[in-house]
Amino acid sequence: MTDSSHENVPSRARRRFPGISSRAYEHPADRSALVALRRLTGFDTVFKALSGLLPERSLRLLFLSDSVRVSEAQFAHLNDMLRDACYILDLEKVPPMYVKQDPQSNAMCIGLDEPIIVVTTGLVELLDEEEMRAVVGHEVGHALSGHSVYRTILLFLTNLAVKVAWIPLGNVAIMAIVTALREWFRKSELSADRAGLLVGQDIQASMRGLMKIAGGNHLHEMNVDAFLAQADEYEKGGDLRDSVLKIMNVLPRTHPFTTVRAAELKKWSETRDFQRIMDGHYPRRDEDKDASVSDSFRESASHYADTVRTSKDPLMKLVGDIAGGAGDLGGKLRDKFTGGGGAAKGGAGPTATDGGGTPGGTAGPEGAAGSEGTEGPEEGPRKA
């Protein structure tokens, strides 16, 4: 987007990111969950069928007729924020935004051909200017990442699942895809939270917005550190029963829990990756075609391995212990059958040392490099 196409620029000095690729802020779990979704049996068939059947024109006409379109004449302050967000993230076409009457605090980016951003009156009335700016940036991040297509399909399939629930086994296949879509969408929220921070460039505003979405407009009664401590307590969880309950609680949700989002975003804001973006060093869109899919897979795998290794959740700890135990057992079996242990005793020192030492020596640095910068927080309001 050229500077001349914007009469409005950010109200205070904010960094702009010309040509930024969504890869710069996408959470590794977002990418890997989308890969898993695309590999799900039947997803491609459903996706292609729905792409031609979904009444997108009807959807646009519905918002046009029953919501307020943001413009210079209506909700001008939101219009300024929207144009600012597109300017900062260099989104060439400003998507239409609508304000819908709804007391629930919510925002979404939907649409198959072109994204549409919708925010509710409940959200507009709840947040101050800088908090709302993070939300608008969050939704523009969804648009830049192309999330609106899958979000639209998720909404449609969720409604369809209710209508066909009476058909034997008719609901099973649909719910399998819906569950996978929800898992991906929860991860995509972490990416969009990061985009919101890049637009607002105010971590405190992002934290305040998330706290308000969780606890309402009583900011004087809330504390960021205490709120983040809740996320830590939630992750630690208690015992394995609590871990299972956490999984069951999150399955029907399209968004991660608010405290988790706040903790993820705060963590990312303190990483070297975030600072590099702010310094102008980030992946660019014109490089996307050259980006290695295998590198993306490795980064995602590294992220999950690091998550299991560092998680305080009892179930994750058990998984890590089992994986670590299996690794130790594998090493012992390898030495047993290759004579690695005996060779060390018998004097074939160089061979044994090279064979056993090299993997051990390279695994550590590789793991550290892989995990660096991939663990990420997130942030921007719950339903945003």
Outline where the language-model segments fall.
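Short helix/loop segments within enzyme catalytic domains
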Residues: 73-79, 85, 89-91, 169-237, ...
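Hydrophobic or amphipathic, alpha-helical segments that drive membrane association/targeting
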Residues: 1-108, 275-384
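Divalent metal-coordination and catalytic microenvironments
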Residues: 82, 119, 138, 192, ...
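Active-site His/Glu-centered metal-binding helix of metallohydrolases
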Residues: 127, 136-145, 191, 195
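Extracytoplasmic and endomembrane cell-envelope/extracellular-matrix remodeling and assembly machinery
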Residues: 212-253, 264-294
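Short pre-active-site segment immediately N-terminal to the catalytic Zn-binding motif
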Residues: 69-73, 77, 118-134, 180-187
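Catalytic Zn2+-binding segment of zinc metalloproteases
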Residues: 140-159
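Short hydrophobic membrane-inserting alpha-helices and related fusion/pore-forming segments
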Residues: 158-174
